[in-house]
Regions:
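Class I SAM-dependent transferase core
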Residues: 1-76, 84-88, 92, 105-108, ...
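Conserved nucleotide-cofactor-binding alpha/beta core module
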Residues: 68-187
Length: 204
């Protein structure tokens, strides 16, 4: 079933071998609510707790590919959610710091990771809009929810050469990649339209 999912992703244009291998290795059904387990290897998003979703595998693969993650990359993830994206990053060999703003999801992820082989360097309950300055700079930052604007703290926390992958927009989002080219300059690229749940700010 995972192999079939990988074949689907390849047909949709995912080419990074490490990303495809991670998707092929990770048991996605473990990250899903029991009512949807039969559909774990379908390329679709499904509901999880707190009105959030586990992202479509294509979206996870595309964001990871755009991040250009390699073994040892220091990555900040904004929105732990189900933990599936976290696991993909970890499987590739990234050092992952992950922030979750929904307390219910944070506790669920915290308990889940204790039982699995996937262990983020740090799992933080907090506001993703402000990033994680104490651990900056990062090789990459990935935002797993739709942001109405690009939070400046996230750009500031990138290393030179680092990438911010963020879906920007209200109803639908444009996948946007900012690459830091100097202390003050960034290169911006866009990669088509996606749909994400909103990135929430400062509420518990």
């Amino acid at each position: 079933m995972r192999k079939k999912l990988v074949e689907t992703l390849e047909k949709k244009g995912i080419t990074n071998p490490a990303v495809l291998q991670a998707i092929n290795t990770i048991p996605r059904h473990l990250f899903m609510d029991s009512g949807f387990i039969d559909h774990a290897y379908v390329d679709k998003a499904f509901p999880i707790a707190a009105d959030q979703t586990i992202s479509q595998p294509y979206t996870v693969a595309r964001q990871t590919e755009l991040l250009e993650v390699v073994k040892g990359s220091k990555i900040l993830e904004i929105g732990t959610g189900s933990g599936y994206q976290t696991a993909v990053l970890l499987e590739i060999g990234a050092v992952v710091y992950s922030i979750e703003r929904q307390n219910k999801l944070f506790k669920k992820a915290e308990n889940f990771f204790k039982k699995q082989k996937y262990t983020p360097k740090k799992l933080i309950f907090g506001d993703g809009y402000i990033g994680l300055e104490t651990e900056a700079p990062f090789d990459g930052i990935v935002v797993t929810a739709g942001a109405p604007f690009v939070p400046k703290p996230l750009l500031a926390q990138l290393k030179i050469g680092g990438k911010l992958v963020i879906p920007v927009g209200d109803v639908s989002q444009i996948m946007t990649v900012y690459t830091r080219t100097s202390q003050t300059a960034f290169n911006k690229e866009t990669f088509g339209e996606f749909r994400f749940v909103p990135l929430l700010e400062n509420k518990n």
